């Protein structure tokens, strides 16, 4: 067996089962393991209990069980400046942001990585479901997690080669039920803890109420694309392209019973556009433009790429052709795509490898801009 005792791995521990098992596996493999809890948000639940305090207790319990030192580090300022301000700015611009992508890029694999280096880390590790492999030239390739349902490469697509060189994903080859089983067999304190869902800083709170604390809502008109007034919307920031619920209009308005969907936003006039039918014509597009294009390894400044892409998490891959120029790209779809959403990530794949991605700016239908923003 390889002697890993001189290799120090600092594990980002959230108090959940995935990061707990990550630390356990590395310890069993003989690494010099340190656990670190990141406090990124000052939060209390509906009972006034600080959720971070409870999570830190779980980290402490697991670290004691497996016999590793542990620390807590506060990244609230970094998180506010680099993730939350971005989140609010995107909503102000009428877009639908993906804070998880930015959190991984700026906090978990930047602020945390920098902190881990001060602890003498050779690597950092997290409980993400992704895999890394190193080729004969020392280049690290990021591959999808073996559990298709849990694969998180979509959220890791903005990581750089430098970040990946320093990263381990010990759960990448495992299925989620196996991770639970390992935790239960080891008797870990977090073995039966349920997974966290949703945006970390919102938690179980009502999204509309939460956003309204930071951005003033501006109600306006809700219209069909052919100009019929359908009533009032609560504020463009509360709606996302392709959304069905929360519109307050039934099928009767259209003379048929098809459900209504958000099909566009006009930020300058504060109009929310709606249409009937899941595959409403205004929701379908043939291409998109994206910025902040980034690849996990060095690529030319300008090139054409035929690959597959995801436009949202847990979506099946779609065949695309990508025309890259600097940090901008035009992505042309082989087949019509529904509800391409500005602000979300577009992520590129070559079979199992995640190549990188960018942030969606606009969707197009045959070179005509769609009803967005």
From Swiss-Prot:
Keywords (alphabetical) are:
ATP-binding, Cytoplasm, Disulfide bond, Nucleotide-binding, RNA-binding, Transferase, tRNA processing, tRNA-binding
Subcellular localization, per the record?
A: Cytoplasm
The entry marks the following residues as binding ATP, namely: 12-19, 38, 127
Q: Which cysteines are joined by disulfide bonds?
A: 103-200
- Keyword Cell membrane annotated: no
Q: Which GO terms describe its cellular component?
A: cytoplasm
**Annotated Gene Ontology MF terms?**
ATP binding; tRNA binding; tRNA-uridine 2-sulfurtransferase activity
Gene3D superfamilies given in the database record? Adenine nucleotide alpha hydrolases-like domains, HUPs, Translation factors
Task: Tell me the InterPro entries matching this sequence.
Answer: MnmA-like, MnmA-like_C, MnmA-like_central, MnmA-like_central_sf, Rossmann-like_a/b/a_fold
What this protein is called in its record is tRNA-specific 2-thiouridylase MnmA
Which species does the entry assign this protein to?
A: Streptococcus agalactiae serotype V (strain ATCC BAA-611 / 2603 V/R)
Q: Encoded by which gene?
A: mnmA
């Amino acid at each position: 067996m390889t002697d890993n005792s001189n290799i120090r791995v600092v594990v980002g521990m959230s108090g959940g089962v995935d990061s707990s098992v990550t630390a356990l596996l590395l310890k069993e493999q003989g690494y010099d393991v340190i656990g670190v809890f990141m406090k990124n948000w000052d939060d209390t639940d509906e009972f006034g209990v600080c959720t971070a305090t409870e999570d830190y207790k779980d980290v402490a319990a697991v670290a004691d069980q497996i016999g590793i030192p542990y620390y807590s580090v506060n990244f609230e300022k970094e998180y506010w400046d680099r993730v939350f301000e971005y989140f609010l700015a995107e909503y102000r611009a009428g877009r639908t942001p993906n804070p998880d992508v930015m959190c991984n890029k700026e906090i978990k694999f930047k602020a945390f990585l920098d902190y881990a280096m001060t602890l003498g880390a050779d690597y950092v590790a997290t409980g993400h479901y992704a895999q890394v492999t190193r080729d004969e030239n020392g280049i690290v390739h990021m591959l999808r997690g073996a559990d298709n349902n849990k694969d998180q490469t979509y959220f890791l697509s903005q990581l750089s080669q430098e970040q990946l060189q320093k990263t381990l994903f010990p759960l990448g080859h495992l299925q989620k039920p196996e991770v639970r089983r390992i935790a239960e067999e080891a008797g870990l304190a977090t073995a039966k803890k349920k997974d966290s869902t949703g945006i970390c800083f919102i938690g179980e709170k009502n999204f509309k109420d939460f956003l309204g604390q930071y951005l003033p809502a501006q109600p306006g008109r809700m219209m069909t694309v052919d100009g019929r007034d359908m009533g009032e919307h609560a504020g463009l920031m509360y709606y996302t392209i392709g959304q069905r619920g929360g519109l307050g209009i039934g099928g009767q308005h259209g003379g048929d019973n098809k459900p209504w969907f958000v099909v566009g936003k006009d930020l300058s006039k504060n109009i929310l556009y709606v249409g009937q039918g899941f595959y409403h014509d205004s929701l379908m597009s043939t291409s998109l433009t994206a910025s902040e294009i980034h690849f996990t390894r060095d690529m030319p400044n300008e090139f054409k790429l035929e690959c597959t892409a995801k436009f949202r998490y847990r979506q099946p891959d779609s065949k695309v052709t990508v025309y890259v120029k600097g940090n901008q790209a035009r992505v042309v779809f082989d087949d019509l795509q529904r509800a391409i959403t500005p602000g979300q990530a577009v992520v590129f794949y070559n079979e199992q490898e995640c190549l990188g991605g960018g942030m969606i700016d606009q969707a197009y239908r045959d070179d005509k801009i769609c009803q967005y923003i």
